[in-house]
Amino acid sequence: MPGVQGVVPPQYIRSMTPETQALVRSATASAAVPFVPEVTLRTAAEPFGLWDRTERDAPPFWAFPWAGGQGLARYVLDHPETVAGRRVLDVASGSGLVAIAAAKAGARTVLATDIDEHALAAITLNAAANGAPQVSPRRLDLAAADHGDAEVILAADVFYQRDLAAMALVFLKAARRAGAAVLAADPARAFVPTAELAPVMTYEIPVLQVLEDTAVKTVTIYSLP
């Protein structure tokens, strides 16, 4: 297959269909992530054209490196002890950026979860391109509140909508009670449950101005006590 060094290894094929991978390939090109240049992602050059192409489906969040994901990926790579040798679950993985960073930081396994089949295809292609065989794309319904045997939960950019933020917090708190470490990242969106989270550090992240109405976002990395 073109675009991933000619071949997608067998462990990635299960999360792709011809239709979803064709759309991801045709709508994106590989590019280094601005704040995480160790990772390349299939990224859309023209956001609104892709939004129009996928208007019958979930929004194409998988086609862009969002601010929270860039921040959490940077944190994990700079602090590999948070994931090294551990089973990791990445919530609402989108492009797979955070999951790939966790794999590069030495995670034992990484479940990169999303509900959008195009996101799962993007994760598949991006993980293969970055040589991250620990990453396994999976569907995950947050309402099920089942984090499996994950020892670390990573969640970036999940607090942008009221109902989703509430559901995500329930999921994260359940995982924390079960003993998993939880790290989240967000650029101060309206529904971040700051009263429940402990700030760890902040980053100034370059973002697409056409999507965020600014060229830089301040992202906070949080832990869940």
Residue ranges and their predicted role:
Residues 4-225:
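S-adenosylmethionine-dependent methyltransferases
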